């Protein structure tokens, strides 16, 4: 079987154990060789992040230091540029070729909103979708139900045999940690050290990153 590369995008504002531990669990579940963290300057379908990309990148580097599973992509870190997943996947495909199995990791909540993404149906022509379960998720989007069902597999071996085209729902339990809750804790003068690496906690406190609370 061919080795899988996976892309894990997000604001990472800040990156925390929920991100890292969940990704590590996924790598063990379906034998992922490399996870590419894809921090974005600000996704087009969400309100813009308040923390600079420079600070977020520094925190990501703290989180993955000496962890060979992870690497960072800077494709979506450019200022004043709108990034769409479909365009980023095309760029990554040009770099790694079309025979390499590739998974794009998203949460179950994002899957239910996939129909608002640009050219969302074409995503499976470039990668698999690897879905992380979410607690208290809303019912599935009826507009997507059949499409999801038609492309879902329970056989993780197919993710290795085919370079793209499938949706796979992880069976792993994920840590229920929220970046929003972490930002709120720092805004209220509390530490969230148990939810993220101590170096990131110290960095946040030294830079006063979340003095202004952003709930998005």
From Swiss-Prot:
Pathway: Cofactor biosynthesis; NAD(+) biosynthesis; deamido-NAD(+) from nicotinate D-ribonucleotide: step 1/1. Its EC number is 2.7.7.18. The keyword Transferase applies. InterPro entries: Cyt_trans-like, NadD/NMNAT, Rossmann-like_a/b/a_fold. Coiled coil: none annotated. It is an enzyme of class 2 (transferase). This is Probable nicotinate-nucleotide adenylyltransferase. It comes from Buchnera aphidicola subsp. Schizaphis graminum (strain Sg). The lineage of its organism: Bacteria, Pseudomonadati, Pseudomonadota, Gammaproteobacteria, Enterobacterales.
